[in-house]
């Protein structure tokens, strides 16, 4: 199963409604699960990103979930494929 790291940055709307972020995160986790995507971790951060998601599942399902999340207008996302050492070794030979 493929794994992805999604970097989260709040929009002005998302920052304005920061107190609602945990409830939105729970709703995302439930929707992702229903779509066949596993949310391995959901973390809020300080710095250039406001949060990080670690997701696993079929590429199209993961990207669909992330696109739906961004379409709500509270966050902007950047999704990166992620690999463990043995996966990278298999890719690079």
How should each PLM-predicted stretch be described?
Residues 1-93:
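A compositional/biophysical signature of low hydrophobicity enriched in polar/charged and small residues
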